[in-house]
Structure formats: structure tokens, C-alpha cells
């Protein structure tokens, strides 16, 4: 299984538009920077037809070291969650490789 990288995205964007590779790479970087900055600012990111990104706070909770069985606390932290939109789920669920 292969992975789609930012470089791959920039190459595809360059092929489909009049942007050169450098400009396409910059566009991809700006897109992800915009999402990151919105999340840092506490905003929800809603991409129609794709899905929603959200920043959530997780509370501290008890955990366990799997090797020793010792109980250890898992500290509170912020996590990014993604919920795929209905159109995206339908598209991914019906397309063949």
C-alpha cells in the first residue's frame, strides 16, 4: 500500500493547473497551514463534501504500562479529530482500487 504525500498532491495540482511545481507546493503548504491556524485559534474546520476537523481536550485518565502492569496517569492533552462527511464516506465506500 502506498501513501499520498504532500509532494504527490503538489505534483497533481501542477499537472491539472497552470501552476509550476514550486507554486503548487506552496499552495498545498498554505492549505494545510490555514487548517492548522484555524484549529489553533479554536475554530472548527468544515470542508464541504469532505469532512470536519476539530480540536478536542482530553482529560487526564489512568493508564497501565503494558510491560509491568504498573498504573500510570495519562496526562491531559489536546487532540485533532476528523469526521468524514457523508459524501466522502459514500465515495470512498463505493470506489474500487
Swiss-Prot record:
Keywords: DNA recombination, DNA-binding, Transcription, Transcription regulation, Translation regulation. Pfam families: Bac_DNA_binding. GO terms for cellular component: cytosol. The keyword DNA-binding applies. CDD domains: IHF_A. GO terms for biological process: DNA recombination; positive regulation of metabolic process; regulation of DNA-templated transcription; regulation of translation. InterPro entries: Hist_DNA-bd, Histone-like_DNA-bd_CS, IHF-like_DNA-bd_dom_sf, IHF_alpha. SUPFAM superfamilies: IHF-like DNA-binding proteins. The keyword Transcription regulation applies. One of its GO terms (molecular function) is structural constituent of chromatin. Belongs to the bacterial histone-like protein family. This protein is one of the two subunits of integration host factor, a specific DNA-binding protein that functions in genetic recombination as well as in transcriptional and translational control. Heterodimer of an alpha and a beta chain. This is Integration host factor subunit alpha. It comes from Acinetobacter baylyi (strain ATCC 33305 / BD413 / ADP1). The lineage of its organism: Bacteria, Pseudomonadati, Pseudomonadota, Gammaproteobacteria, Moraxellales.
